Structures are given as structure tokens and as C-alpha cells.
Amino acid sequence: MANQVSTDLFGNPIDPVVGYARGSILRGTDEEVVRMLRARQMVGERVRSKGKESVFDLSGMNRGAGIGADEVPHLTSHVPFFERFEGRTEPYALRHMGADPTRHKALIINRVSAANFIALTTLLARGHHVYALAPAGGSTHPSAIRPITMVGATFTQFHSVDELERAWRERGAPRLLLITPISASKRHIELADVRRALALPRDSSTLAYVDDAHMASRVGYFREPRTFELGAVDLAVCSADKHVAGPRAGVFVGRADLVTQIGSRVYELGLEAQAGQYVGVANALRNFDPEVIRQAGLLAEQLLVVLQSKYGSKAYLGGPGVSIVGDDALEIAQGRAAKGKTTLVAVEAAGIVAMEMLAEDGILTIGAVSMPSSAPVVRLMMYPDGHRLGVQRIAASLDKALNKLGRVLDDLDTAREILLGPAAHRGATQSIAVEPATALSAR
């Protein structure tokens, strides 16, 4: 059985919910929200002063409206919306995820995290056991861990199918098998292992839930089957914006009886996609092109060669992108700066690199605009703008940002200003009231 690691590479205690160490700058959700909002403002200011083309999006996400001009007149109120669009997105969702319309049903939910929250809090109760299979080097997303904890269920995470199978055999089948084929850190479970996990013998009450937020990467880059073609899946969610040209939304599909049950709570709590979002998702799923992702992956493979020549195995292929975990970014920076122990932690290091690449070169990565609890990893996704930049410019920008990280390893005031803005060292950071025990990391 895989136990949670209690400290990071530098001995800092890991928060078991988010899976990384909290720092003295990014202490929790409040500060991570400030960093995210600052990055959004930086993008806006750059576009206003230098134009939209001055920003190079390496986030792997689109998050535009996905709506055509001809559709806008039908979104002026719910009356024309119902006539033109109601019920037309769900068939695309079923097809996109490889589901069977005679057995499955779809819902469009406002976020992947909202889908995780509502599904898991509906299906689980105190005393239930959840076995989670996550990639080696990765983790189940906090937006799934939090609702499991909230209802009092027991969460056990495994990083190999052998360990999962051993626990299954010794302890019996759980209430829920939760599989994350690709983690937020862009680690990937081999297809054969996913299929093996889904084939484990189940009790009548055992359900299989796949948090397939990155399904588009699996299909486009890894050439794997769509979610419901993997095996006996009861419920699953994928993203409408991760390597898909749609708005931020969760495409939630599953057994018709379960989706009906969960759907009632979706409407109770106002988690359903709204009109414009609903239409944008339909367009994104209808026009989904795996070849675009494959081309991004080929560029990522070229970038990997360049970065591994500088950083060795610390740079790894994260599907159609290249990643360096925050702890490794700290080690690289320490080596260059010839400095000893730092008080910065991985999430701060990854954030500083991301904010520097944005400020200096207009390169927008997940680490700058990610929601709280996103994995502390430098992620360079080649979709959508990697080809516009080219490998050498991306590598040069990363190198400069790592040098900057090295210079601020022992300068907390400057590090804080990079992450939170010039007012941060004066104690003027924005305060967002979020209870840490219940805050949901949104995707």
C-alpha cells in the first residue's frame, strides 16, 4: 500500500489534502488566490499595452467562450436558448467520452471540480472506503480528496496497480475505485494498468469513477481510448478546456440512474453549466481535433531534448508538454546560485518561475493562473501557442526564470513581490475568506 509522503525533498511538512508543503509566502488558499488574480492582471496589462499577440499561451487550456457570432442572438434570453440549444450538448458529451447513449447519460457542469464534489458527496457516506489509483509521482486531485474527506469516507491512495490489487484482495472491494489517469503534474498511468484496475472483482455496491480531466491528452497524444472504452466505468468527468477549445466546464457522463440521482443535486446547488457555457461546450466537443494535440506533443518531445541537456531527468515529458517539479526547480536554482538551504517551498518556486516567464517574456503557463491547490510544478504545455514561440525561445525564457529564482532564494521580500505584487511586503495582500477544510480546488 502506498503511504502519503509526510515531507518534501527539503524536509518541509506536506499538507495531505493538497499534496505539497505550504510556504511562508503562499501559506494557503488566500495567498494562492492573490497570486492567480495578479497573473490575470499582468496578462490584461500586457495585452492593453502590447497587443494580444504579445502573450504566448503555454497553459494547455483555452477557456474562451467558444461561441460563434451567429449564436449570440439566440442567447439574449432563455426563451430562444431553449428553442435553439436545449438538449443538444449532451449527445456530443456522450460521443466525446465514448459512452453508450442507451445506458449512459450526460450533464454539463460548471467545473470539473464541481463534478467531483457533487458526485462524491452524493455517492459516499461516513465509513465508506475509497481506493484511489494515481500515477507514480502524481496524486489524486484535491478537488476529489476534499469531498471524500468532507463526508467522512476513508481515502487510500495507491501509485501502482500491484499495490491496489493486493489491498483489494486482502481487504475486499471498496465502495469506490477512483482513477486519475493523468495527474495535475502531468504524470500518466499506463493504459494496461488502468484496464487492470477496472477489471478487479467488485461487490454489488462498488463503483468505478474516472477523473479523466486530461482525457483529450490521453486520446490525442497517448492515442488511448476514450473514457468509457477503457473498461467497466460507472461515472467519469473530463474537461471542456484542457487541450480542448472550449470554456471551463466539466463534461460529466455515467450510468443513467447515477447521473439522474447526482443531477438532482447539481440543480439544487446551482452547479449546472449556464447558457453560454453550455453552447460553448457543444462547439468544443463537436470540433475536437486530436491531431492538434499530437502536433503539440511532437513539439514537446523536441523541447524535452533541449531541456534535458540542461537539467537532466528533472525535466520530464508530461504528455504534450514538459514539466519540472517545484522541488527540482529549487535544486536547479540552488546549484546555479551556489546557495544553501532556502525557506522557499516547491509551490513558491514553481510560481516564481511562472510569474517571471509571464512578466519578462509574456509566456503564460499554468503555474501563473492556476487555481489554489494546483500541483507545484513548472508546466510548459505546447498547446496552443508552442509553435508560435519555438523551442529555443521557450528554453531561454525558462532558463532566465530559473536564474531569477536562484537570486531570490534568500530574499523573501522580492520573492513575495514577484508572487503577490508590490504591495505584498507591506501587508496589503488581498484577503479571501475561504475555510481551508472545505475549500475546493477548481479546475
What kind of feature is each model-predicted range?
Residues 1-62, 308, 319, 415-443:
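N-terminal glycine-rich, Lys/His-bearing helix-loop that initiates the first secondary-structure elements
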Residues 2-32, 316-417:
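Conserved C-terminal alpha-helix-loop-beta "cap" of PLP-dependent enzymes
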Residues 6-17, 88, 92-293, 304-311, ...:
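Conserved PLP-enzyme active-site core in the AAT-like
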Residues 26, 32-118, 142-147:
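Conserved N-terminal alpha-helix of the aminotransferase class I/II PLP-enzyme fold
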Residues 40-52, 70-76, 215-221, 234-239, ...:
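Short, mixed-charge, low-aromatic patches
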Residues 79, 251-254, 338:
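Short, surface-exposed, charged loop/turn segments at secondary-structure junctions
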